[in-house]
Amino acid sequence: MDLAPRPLGRQHSKSQSAFAFDNTATSIAASTMKNELNHLASTVKDPLAKKAFQKEMDNFFSLFSRYLQEDARGSEINWDLVESPKPEQVVEYDTITEAGGLSRDYLNKLAVLKLNGGLGTTMGCVGPKSIIEVRDGNSFLDLSVRQIEHLNRKYNVNVPFVLMNSFNTDEATAKVIKKYEAHKIDILTFNQSRYPRVHKETLLPVPHTADSAIDEWYPPGHGDVFEALTNSGIIDTLIAQGKEYLFVSNIDNLGAVVDLNILNHMVETNAEYLMELTNKTKADVKGGTLIDYDGNVRLLEIAQVPPQHVEEFKSIKKFKYFNTNNLWFHLPSVKRVVNNHELSMEIIPNKKTIKHKGENINIIQLETAAGAAIRHFKNAHGVNVPRRRFLPVKTCSDLLLVKSDLYSINHGQVEMNPRRFGGTAPLVKLGAHFKKVADFSAHIPSIPKILELDHLTITGDVNIGRNVTLKGTVIIVASDANRIDIPNGSVLENCVITGNLNILEH
């Protein structure tokens, strides 16, 4: 039985007449959508561009049709078949064979891909998230380039650096990467697909022409990486260069660096697909996890879990790991599953309300996640890796950590300070005043020393002075209309600060 794709927790018991009605409605919706997509394609005049657009719309229609069928079928997972993964389905990093003398040979067969489709809007920035300054004047992109350059120089190899952009990030990224032209690194870029947003009520596409406004389209999640790699021709380019393996990760995960032991393990085990997982903490209980489903390895996301089993899903005892989205692919195998139409990843219906031509409209975006493809590859399994390989920067709370004395940069790689006790990062929660990078920088112009910090919470209008040290648990709360200025040189240890404290400059 297949792992069902969607918000799963509904029990369906339909009569034959209800099924017949649903099937008829599904057929009509599919037929109408097909006509609309054909109309969109007819608005493209250039023959080559039209062919590429038609291919994209065919892929979208396949996704849309599957969505309709699953919606009518009302399928859900059978929780009785869900088990913790077997030892061979998730291998411990400490047990895999260390890379030996063949490292250079294997590296010559490797390419590195960063998912670069996202904007920096959630952190208050304009343009691709990858160009946000992270540390010492370096952006996410800069750090990635430095890592690959060092790898190529150290082993005398040529590992290409590949960026999967979206239509939101492609133009800005093309301008930025020009500065690397003199560097010893081959940079390849391609775009993930551009799919039409769909009206929730009518199930019709929002755009009326292929060049309709940008807000009428969406990038369909990183599960699109397989088809986009193939359709763009990048996969053929890499294979022609002798590349067989691809390491894929989010560009904002500063821990996702090339690991020779994992590459060696992939080659030695003939794995077509590897997923890096790491141990859950209380902060990660909602993350997707690998399961044994009726004897097969599957990715399970919280949205797929029936409501009565959500707490069990969050259990660290039964499901110890979560997906870091550091993935390793065997390129010829990717080409095979795409060309044979074997991919059938779980669909994530992203329903939202957007502003369109001055009005609010309800839309659906059909997305997929690359981790869900694990069940389509041979010898695919997970590797439980150290936490250091998962260091995402999603918020300014994360940014404070990576800018601090907790970490240092070595050839583009972010490494934890060996003087940090326990080797884990403190828990940092910054309030709404710190949501945007510009506001964060204004309130904390100089990053405090946090080597001995366990927990930091700051809410309200709080300003941190220079050369401040934070230790233990520190909570600073400025209530409405109040402001707290932490003086230069302060040492705060295991304290709670509330109220109003203004420091006047003389």
UniProtKB/Swiss-Prot annotation:
GO terms for biological process: glycogen metabolic process; UDP-alpha-D-glucose metabolic process. This is Probable UTP--glucose-1-phosphate uridylyltransferase. The modification Phosphoserine is found at residues 15, 17. Belongs to the UDPGP type 1 family. It catalyses: alpha-D-glucose 1-phosphate + UTP + H(+) = UDP-alpha-D-glucose + diphosphate. The keyword Transferase applies. It is found in: Cytoplasm; Nucleus. Its EC number is 2.7.7.9. It comes from Schizosaccharomyces pombe (strain 972 / ATCC 24843). One of its GO terms (cellular component) is cytosol. Its main location: cytoplasm. GO terms for molecular function: metal ion binding; UTP:glucose-1-phosphate uridylyltransferase activity. It is an enzyme of class 2 (transferase). Mg(2+) binds at residues 129, 252. It comes from the Eukaryota. Plays a central role as a glucosyl donor in cellular metabolic pathways. Homooctamer. Keywords: Cytoplasm, Magnesium, Metal-binding, Nucleotidyltransferase, Nucleus, Phosphoprotein, Transferase.
